[in-house]
């Protein structure tokens, strides 16, 4: 078992996207990007800023508060910047990719399709990223369970990218394997020396992977479906509530989590996600369809822009795990918060890619509430419909506390893979039958509740304890039979930190020919990530 599992995991670790790069595709995309950048620059100059949503966002300013207006009952739109300060620069380990040719190469190779002329691509020094990640973990420990001076200091140094579409890449010498170390130490060192100006020559033989991507989704049919399904699930009591970080953070949870009627979840704190489904007054096929439709619509919005997501799903989710996903996604849990901040943290028990989205209801002003990725040196205020897709098990992240004026509500929702639950559910499904599992778990909850009503808490606990022992035995038996829902590292019991590496063996031939013709200045602009 261990040899087979290790081999399977190694294949996942070394996974690469199908090659989409070609000279003609690269040239066409580079020309499109160059033209779109000129048009976007002209529009930005005319508007006094980058026009995203309902108002121009000036990149010279860090947005601290925004006003939202709700002309219709669906989504409130951000209409103006209320408060701001000068925007700090990016940290030295994060550099913008100025060359449209290099941007095209990375987009094609990594499966990233952002709006031409409306996005910025960055390359992040892996060694400094690891160090910054560790510093963010230390700041969190210094402040405890509430935002304090250490975390605020990190936020003040972050550059605001509100209203922008951005993608971050990093590079490592060896795509397989993980660094031993403390929290956040998941990257291998890559570039040496104080000057970080990576070029194609320096990337040759190294592996590049996507770390994070921020998307600005236009309001339309898909966002209408998403918001309608959230409304349906909230209004019918589909979500249950759990407190985190000492009760300072309240989260509404739903999805496919392992039943724990003894109160101890396989994924600590997420028993409520399953309880919400099996105790809901509208539990059943219709409600499950609503939950599936929500997850699949969000997934479709993302995979149109990040084509590596379906490949990620197909690699890590086994046949035994598929029945416990929310539709054709790699999501089994959905959380929802209302006007909430959350401390900086890592989600080490989650799958590789987490999707977080925001939308707003009613009118008013929000001060604070920025989403912060300190190791990437960025923060942003969510606008009309902002989505971030990132390696939440690798990159420290959090949301600053916020204050509101008026009736404005900022809904923030996370779609993620809690892989311990998927494994446990797959093993229980193999033991009892996938189709019978929901009914069995619902019956167990009812039996515990009946024991409590008839004979008191002590009797209920004894019944629950027997059920927990039965489940544990079934899980262990199926684990021994090699049943698993997700491919994980057999040594650490966790998922890989990053997936889909593109190893650059040589500079693209087209770039080499263009450089030879254009001269040194043109060569520097076309080959060097940082420009001339």
Curated annotation (Swiss-Prot):
Null allele phenotype: Decreased 5-glyceryl-methylcytosines (5gmC) DNA modification in the genome. Reduced fitness of cells during exposure to high light levels. Defects may be caused by hypermethylation and down-regulation of LHCSR3, a protein-coding gene required for the protection of C.reinhardtii cells from photo-oxidative damage under high light conditions, causing a reduced capacity for photoprotective non-photochemical quenching.
Catalytically driven reaction(s): a 5-methyl-2'-deoxycytidine in DNA + L-ascorbate + O2 = a (8S,9S)-5-glyceryl-2'-deoxycytidine in DNA + glyoxylate + CO2; a 5-methyl-2'-deoxycytidine in DNA + L-ascorbate + O2 = a (8S,9R)-5-glyceryl-2'-deoxycytidine in DNA + glyoxylate + CO2
Compartments where located: Nucleus
Binding site residues for Fe cation: 345, 347, 397
Entry keywords, A to Z: Dioxygenase, Iron, Metal-binding, Nucleus, Oxidoreductase
Cofactor-binding details, from the entry: Binds 1 Fe(2+) ion per subunit.
Transferase is among the record's keywords: no
Residues annotated for L-ascorbate binding in this entry: 335-337, 397-399
The EC number(s) this enzyme carries: 1.14.99.-
Cofactor: Fe(2+)
Outcome of swapping residue 330 to V: Abolished dioxygenase activity
GO cellular component, one term: nucleus
Primary localization: nucleus
Domain of life: Eukaryota
Any Gene Ontology biological process: regulation of photosynthesis
Molecular-function GO terms, alphabetical: dioxygenase activity; iron ion binding; methylcytosine to 5-glyceryl-methylcytosine dioxygenase activity
Function: Dioxygenase that catalyzes DNA modification by mediating the conversion of the modified genomic base 5-methylcytosine (5mC) into 5-glyceryl-methylcytosine (5gmC). Catalyzes the conjugation of a glyceryl moiety from L-ascorbate (vitamin C) to the methyl group of 5mC through a carbon-carbon bond. 5gmC DNA modification may be required during photosynthesis as an epigenetic mark that couteracts DNA methylation.
Similarity comment text for this entry: Belongs to the TET family.
Protein name, as recorded: 5-methylcytosine-modifying enzyme 1
Organism: Chlamydomonas reinhardtii
Taxonomic lineage of the native organism: Eukaryota, Viridiplantae, Chlorophyta, core chlorophytes, Chlorophyceae
